[in-house]
Amino acid sequence: MAGLQLVTPASSPMGPFFGLPWQQEAIHDNIYTPRKYQVELLEAALEHNTIVCLNTGSGKTFIAVLLIKELSHQIRGENGKRTVFLVNAASSVAQQASTVRTHSDLQVGDYMSEDMTSWPEEMWNREMIENQVLVMTCHIFLHVLKNGVLPLSKINLLVFDECHLAITGHPYREIMKICEGCPSCPRILGLTASILNGKCDPCDLEEKIQNLEKILQSNAETATDLVVLDRYASQPREEVLDCGQYQDQSGLSERLLNELDEALNFLNDCNLSVHREDRDPTFISKQVLNDCRAVLTVLGPWCADKAAGIMVRELQKYIKHEQEELNRKFLLFTDTILRKIHALCEEHFSPASLDLKFVTPKVIRLLEILHEYKPFERQQFESVEWYNNRNQDNYVSWSDSEDDDEDEEAEAKEKTEANFPSPFTNILCGIIFVERRYTAVVLNRLIKEAGKQDPELAYISSNFITGHSIGKNQPRNKQMEVEFRKQEEVLRKFRAHETNLLIATSIVEEGVDIPKCNLVVRFDLPTEYRSYVQSKGRARAPVSNYIMLADSERTKTFQEDLKTYKAIEKILRNKCSKSAECNDFELEPVTDDDNVLPPYVLRSEDGGPRVTMNTAIGHVNRYCARLPSDPFTHLAPKCKTVEMNTGGYRSTLFLPINSPLRVPVTGPVMNCARLAEKAVALLCCEKLHKIGELDDHLMPVGKETVKYEEELDLHDEEETSVPGRPGSTKRRQCSPKAIPECLRGCYPVPEQPCYLYVIGMVLTTPLPDELNFRRRKLYPPEDTTRCFGILTAKPIPRIPHFPVYTRSGEVTISIELQKSGFSLSAEQLELITRLHQYIFSHILRLEKPALEFKPVEADSAYCVLPLNIVEDSNTLDLDFKFMEDIEKSEARIGIPNTQYTKQNPFIFKLEDYQDAVIIPRYRNFDQPHRFYVADVYTDLTPLSKFPSPEYETFAEYYKTKYNLDLSNVNQPLLDVDHTSSRLNLLTPRHLNQKGKALPLSSAEKRKAKWESLQNKQILVPELCAIHPIPASLWRKAVCLPSILYRLHCLLTAEELRSQTAIDAGVGAQTLPPDFRYPNLDFGWKKSIDSKSFISCPSACMEEDDDHCKLGTSSDSNHTAPESCSMEVSQPPEGAPNTPDEKLETLTLPVTDLNKDCFPNLPNGTQADSDDLPHRSDVCQCSQLGPLERDLSTQTTTSVSVRPSPAGEPQPWPSDECTGRSSDLCDPHVKKPTSKHCPKSETATSTPAPSETSSEDCRSACAGPAWDSPKTLGPNPGLILQALTLSNASDGFNLERLEMLGDSFLKHAITTYLFCTYPDAHEGRLSYMRSKKVSNCNLYRLGKKKGLPSRMVVSIFDPPVNWLPPGYVVNQDKSSTDKWDSDENKDLANGKASDDEDEDDDDEPEEAEVEPSKEDVNVEDDLEYYYEHIRFIDSMLIGSGAFGKKISLQPTDPGYEWKAPKKAHNSHFSPDGGADEFDYSSWDAMCYLDPSKAGEEDDFVVGFWNPSEENCGTDIGKQSISYDLHTEQCIADKSIADCVEALLGCYLTSCGERAAQLFLCSLGLKVLPPEKQSSGGSAELQYGWLKIPPRCMFEHPDAERTLNHLISGFLNFESKINYTFKNKAYLLQAFTHASYHYNTITDCYQRLEFLGDAILDYLITKHLYEDPRQHSPGVLTDLRSALVNNTIFASLAVKYDYHKYFKAVSPELFHVIDDFVQFQLEKNEMQGMDSELRRSEEDEEKEEDIEVPKAMGDIFESLAGAIYMDSGMSLETVWQVYYPMMRPLIEKFSANVPRSPVRELLEMEPETAKFSPAERTYDGKVRVTVEVVGKGKFKGVGRSYRIAKSAAARRALRSLKANQPQVQNN
């Protein structure tokens, strides 16, 4: 082996760093990274007449089109010249013309028919005027020239397609003759692909080229792809090794040859006459034996034996399937021969082990070469593993720049590694080329065998690939498909370096994507030039060897061939533009030039970083490679070297246009070209370092090492023991629940001034009839004067009125100051305190062991007490008399034990029972049930017939069951209702969270049920005690927890608002005295039916969102907004309030309405004036139309505004509103809805609130009403919405606001970064942006701002997680309420459950009338189930019985609900455990998942796994223990969401500037700070962003260059209807990074970064404000459907952006070309996905068309350009873009597209599984999705994401085809 000196990477002078074959692109160290050859050809063509010799047709068009575009400024305008494109055949005219049309906006004429030669001159003149580019056949052009129609002087460019024809006598020749005589001859471009065919003689070749050059007066530039490889890569070392003859000592080889030759002769002699169409019967046999013989001669007997074994197996298959007897005999004959060979071999060697005596010298030589590549010890195999693990993803999304920022960090890590030497240095990456398939297969076996026997070769992991079936166009059968797959797997492994040696047939020579190899062995010599060059070109690693193995007899002849090849190569290389000088010095040894110029040294110490002459070029290349670019562009520096007259050389270096160093760098004069290039690179490194583009190690600065540290205010990571990544959903932390300052420590003190507030309650929307199943009478709270008040020592700020939903309908609550400054005595206060405790402990039964009443210590302590009208003053005051009466009553706590006897019978007094709560005295003594008297049945007595057959009469029932005797058998009976156990009245029971009615079990059934006596609870007055608290007050008491909770939340929000007013200067710190925000409402009305609103969008804006949807009015008018719509129907005060009031009332003038409804509200009037106009009234009025319609069919109250589907009862709107929140999953569960609705629902619900907001937004922009609040800040209701998570199941949540905030945040930060760092390129900007908008950062800021404790995280469930005022959590006992302890939990809930059970009559026995327990007392069936479930759940929660499905769906299976997979964020803090969640636990924890629910009602079911989702911490599996009453547990990500939602809230209420100030106050800089003026307050003032000053570089004749570059853009401006004031922005928006001719502006990347955020914000804002009030789920889907590259690219093509696009990138050109063709055929927009389908039928081609990201980018960059050009006006951008996007927005809003992947996962959540990516042989990615039981589907694309969605699309198509019933939503 001595003769062979291989330079393996480790021994290379460049050091191990360059040996890594996988450095994705090797970086050259002493030549500038070469650019794509097409680019260089274009450059040449721009400089002089050129003949382009290319191998492919496509490359030629690219060069021709780009050249035409580059010179197009000469052909536009009045006396522009014309460009002529000549083709040889008429058939190619149309094709070339259409390519030019596609890629430019020039007018193209095509002329091909012979009769055009007879056209009169004026026709030609007209054509010349109309068209700028003329594509014609050479004959027509010749005619035109001869007739002088178009003089040559009017032509700027003449393109000859297939110009080699000019050598023969062809019209081209004559055309050129005419040109020769002409002084002003046009520029000439010749295109040819056929200069080299097969073997040709170098002399002929040279002559042919010279001849052509002469005729066309051009220089031939063969960047044929043939040389290109050489020219670029460092040349591999070529060796021809003569291996000598095989010495056949044993004679085995000879015997085998004889056998085979004899057999072959026999086959050849059988001259069977075969019909032409029949198969030759000996064909297979000959083929097999020839292959075997070839293996024998090339590899030797050992391999021939292996080959024979393989062949025998293959023959068996043929024999089995062969029908023809004769053919079969030949196959059997062959089989015998092969077996004979095997037998002969066995005599000489054992087939098991490899014996080198029986292989040829070539094989031995090959093994010796492989020995040389053995890695050093330390990195045997793990190195490969290490490598694979490191780079795994590189192979997948190697270029998918669209991946989100999430991956950026990961990527960064990877890149840095790639720049430094890896831990192992000498790894083989080699290919062995052989001629035949069998040679490859067997050689692979041999190498594997050798590896087993020779430890030195153990490092080799080889595989083979054969070209069989890789042909793209052959029909593929199953088996080929399998083969094909195998090959791809082989290639994948080779690319991933899992295998390091590939044995291949010529297939791998061209067109297959494989890594750069450092060893290429031609086992069989190349037979033609192309094969030589292609295989040599595979050795592209910087240190590589190209070894050709020859036998002695062929060595001589081959040496000759090799000379020929080298000569051809040389000729071609000389024709290669600019290549000559590179090669000369590439080959000479690296001399030490370092002393020519001193190195640039950073620090003088030894080994300090330095750049020397020799390393400078490498540094520049490496820098360029790190600039941002897309998969198609490899940025490289451009160096021009000129010879000076003085004799030296000077180079000028141009960096890619997106580098901040834009000025060309000119180097010193040196005495040779190579030194000049090195010197200029050295200078360039110095400049790059000085401007901060190279770091102090002189490596390119990554985007991470930003020089803008201040931007990334690096915060110390907080230390917490909490596991999980900060900012993620997985990490949860506890925080105390906030208590508003005004409620802290405000317990009244004797003799100190107090404030008394009245809790006003007005029924604004009575319950509609259809929901009033029991036909209960409604009890408007305003009918009785006694009510509750709040007594406190501190004033309470004004807050919006808000609704609660009782059994009577929607009640609007107001908190009004009644009197202040008075004081009370100690006795009075004690009485009040006792009564306060009595309300919470006895009436509401909220006291439990964990809570103690200690008003003085409690965090929030104020008194709740009864008020009544004082004598006749008509003013409310404290009702001391009533309090004293209660104290005295015996029924106050227990059950009085009055005994009635026959002597002292019971006497019935009707008036005692009119407004009474009664207690049965004969059961449940510890916690007696309390009932409202609903009706007195005077026609029934205890002797009436008992409803069920077991008992005759009621008296008998009581006697039998309880042994009770009645003293009065004539008393009437009482129909009673349970007092309410539902204490969460925040949202209505009958609606889901979206404000849609829940499907009810049919109304008729229910009515029937409640009307029959059987289903009523009937009690006997004598057996009951009357409670001292009247029913009317009791009903109000039930509302207290909800009212106080809502009050508390609104005050927290108000506090946040005034805090922000101080911090950010947005809004007023204190409100004007008479100001009140509009009511809180859920905005459902609006959304109820979008249609009604479309007419009046502004109508609904409510500003404060949540609250006031309708009521935007700022007054408190209690029109509860929600109620608004209903309100309409509500009669003026005097009218009887019965539900069936008919429509007329609707017509009331709105204003009165408001007044009437609240006649006595103090501030009822003010608002009307100003906001009504745009508030409810619109809704009201405009709604009348629709309302009327609806109403007529239903009773008024039900105004819900959406025509109800028949039979479905209308919900009461009011409820409606709330309902949303509750969205109960199961339709039936009425009651729970509100309270319990599973969190998830909430999620669904989200829409509501947000809806509201959207409106606001609009209003914000719009109406007058805004002025007032705008200056005050957002309505606390809206802030509350932003603080409410969907898990809280309230009537609103932050999701819609969050989406709006999210897009505004992105926009604000983007604009700030863009303006503040005019020099940072897009990669850096997006890195800074991703850091600032990351959830982790937002979470930090939100936490600093104190949001976690103010957020509303879990569902409000008074018995479980609400702390009544004046109570404290008793530490010792509190464990009972900790989330972790289960038993107590049960306790807690269990207990709750009883009282909750509103209807629970535990003892069915006494069903008074109840045959079936449930019927009886279920307030609504649901209520009952629900309670029940709750109870069960509470038990379950501890027991782990989660997997079971408890299905409670008595009715309506159609409404299936499915559960989600998300923890509803903080689900409520785990706490709620029991109760809380129970609801959801319905389906054993099934819960709705908003994220999945696509449309309103389809929810998705998943299973909730408490350990994960809920406890939040699943990480350490430890559960977080915390107190439910005073703490809440929140996922970090929810805090980040809340920050975005608050931003959305400020944005909609106060406008963009306020939102920016709000961000600055959080600590996110989005405005430049200003030095405050002396007079100003101390806090920081923020200025306005300034547009970056320069968009054009200093350049001698910038203006002229600009006009030259944008010639033709006028048409574009008129197309988009916007004229740029500064055209440089326009040019920049269309300049791709590869377009180096633009020397005056940057490329579009920065503008794209800006435009992307602007369009995202504008589109999101538009969708948010859509009157249809899309739900959050729909909003998300619409946003992703509209804001994505596919849509943008499609629109860009539709509006011709591609015709003005400036790029020099051949691959990009082709992708755009394909895409444009595709769009033209489709001619309609596509949804969601980046890979629009090509055509539905061609199933075989599972690849989708690729969407050129650059097209989407320029669509965005133009938006950025307009924004900057218009002085940062979003309106201007939207005026230009809305018309383009409108059709799509409308189309998608009507039918929301979902991404195929998501749709598939929703359709088959359990069964669809995506495979990891595989690489296909041409470098694309393939993904397979398996839908278990329904098949596997594959998709292919340039990135994993694209391939994945292609696979999903195929799967969907197939699934939908097979089951038509899959509804396509």
Curated annotation (Swiss-Prot):
A motif (DECH box) lies at residues 161-164. The record marks K1749 as: Important for activity. InterPro entries: DEAD/DEAH_box_helicase_dom, Dicer_dimer_sf, Dicer_dimerisation_dom, DICER_DSRM, Dicer_PBD, Dicer_platform, dsRBD_dom, Helicase_ATP-bd. SMART domains: DEXDc, DSRM, HELICc, PAZ, RIBOc. Residues 616-708 form the Dicer dsRNA-binding fold domain. Residues 397-417, 713-732, 1111-1142, 1190-1259, 1373-1417 are annotated as: Disordered. It is found in: Cytoplasm. Residues 419-588 form the Helicase C-terminal domain. Residues 1374-1388 have a biased composition (Basic and acidic residues). Mg(2+) 2 binds at E1648, D1753, E1756. Residues 1792-1857 form the DRBM domain. GO terms for molecular function: ATP binding; deoxyribonuclease I activity; helicase activity; metal ion binding; pre-miRNA binding; ribonuclease III activity; RNA binding. Pfam families: DEAD, Dicer_dimer, Dicer_dsRBD, Dicer_PBD, Dicer_platform, Helicase_C, PAZ, Ribonuclease_3. Residues 1240-1252 have a biased composition (Low complexity). Residues 1111-1128, 1192-1201 have a biased composition (Polar residues). Its cofactor is Mg(2+); Mn(2+). GO terms for biological process: apoptotic DNA fragmentation; cranial skeletal system development; global gene silencing by mRNA cleavage; heterochromatin formation; melanocyte differentiation; miRNA processing; miRNA-mediated gene silencing by mRNA destabilization; miRNA-mediated post-transcriptional gene silencing. Mg(2+) 1 binds at E1298, D1377, D1380. Component of the RISC loading complex (RLC), or micro-RNA (miRNA) loading complex (miRLC), which is composed of dicer1, ago2 and tarbp2; dicer1 and tarbp2 are required to process precursor miRNAs (pre-miRNAs) to mature miRNAs and then load them onto ago2. Note that the trimeric RLC/miRLC is also referred to as RISC. Double-stranded RNA (dsRNA) endoribonuclease playing a central role in short dsRNA-mediated post-transcriptional gene silencing. Cleaves naturally occurring long dsRNAs and short hairpin pre-microRNAs (miRNA) into fragments of twenty-one to twenty-three nucleotides with 3' overhang of two nucleotides, producing respectively short interfering RNAs (siRNA) and mature microRNAs. SiRNAs and miRNAs serve as guide to direct the RNA-induced silencing complex (RISC) to complementary RNAs to degrade them or prevent their translation. This is Endoribonuclease Dicer. The gene is dicer1.
